[in-house]
C-alpha cells in the first residue's frame, strides 16, 4: 500500500515526464543540487546537475529510452520504489530492451536527492 504523500508521487511523475520529453531543465528543477543519479548503462553514479545533464546528453546520443512509472511503493526507510516500464530503442528505432525495472528514490525537502536502479520484489 502506498503511504507516500501525493506531492512526492507527483514530483516523481513530473520527473519521468520531463525525462521522456528530454526537458533536462524541468527535470533538474526537481532535484537537489547534489543529486546522485545512476549511470544505468555504464555503471557508477553522476552527482549534481551538470553531471546529470552531461550524462543524459551522452545517453540520448546513443539510445532512446522511454520510462513510464506503473506503480509506486513506500518503503520502511521512507524511500519510494517505483515499478517502471522501460523501453529502450536504438537511434534507428529498433527496440533493444523492453522490461520492468525498479527505481528507488530518496526525496529531501520535496526534491529528488538520490535515484538508484534496483530489482523489483518478486510477485511470486
Language-model region placement:
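Hydrophobic pocket/interface hotspot
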Residues: 12-15, 26-28, 35, 48, ...
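A beta-strand edge to alpha-helix "cap/lid" segment located at domain peripheries
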Residues: 1-3, 53-124
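A short gly/proline-enriched turn/hairpin at secondary-structure junctions
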Residues: 36-46, 58-62, 118
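Short, charged low-complexity linear motifs
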Residues: 22-25, 38-43, 91
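Short, low-complexity N-terminal intrinsically disordered segments enriched in polar/charged residues
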Residues: 1-30, 123-124
Amino acid at each position: 500500500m502506498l503511504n507516500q504523500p501525493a506531492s512526492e508521487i507527483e514530483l516523481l511523475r513530473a520527473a519521468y515526464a520531463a525525462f521522456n520529453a528530454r526537458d533536462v531543465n524541468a527535470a533538474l528543477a526537481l532535484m537537489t543540487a547534489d543529486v546522485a543519479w545512476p549511470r544505468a548503462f555504464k555503471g557508477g553514479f553522476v552527482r549534481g546537475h551538470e553531471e546529470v545533464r552531461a550524462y543524459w546528453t551522452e545517453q540520448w546520443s546513443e539510445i532512446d529510452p522511454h520510462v513510464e512509472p506503473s506503480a509506486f511503493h513506500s518503503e520502511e526507510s521512507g524511500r519510494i520504489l517505483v515499478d517502471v516500464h522501460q523501453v529502450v530503442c536504438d537511434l534507428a528505432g529498433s527496440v533493444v530492451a523492453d522490461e520492468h525495472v525498479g527505481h528507488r528514490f530518496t526525496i529531501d525537502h520535496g526534491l529528488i536527492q538520490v535515484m538508484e536502479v534496483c530489482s523489483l520484489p518478486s510477485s511470486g
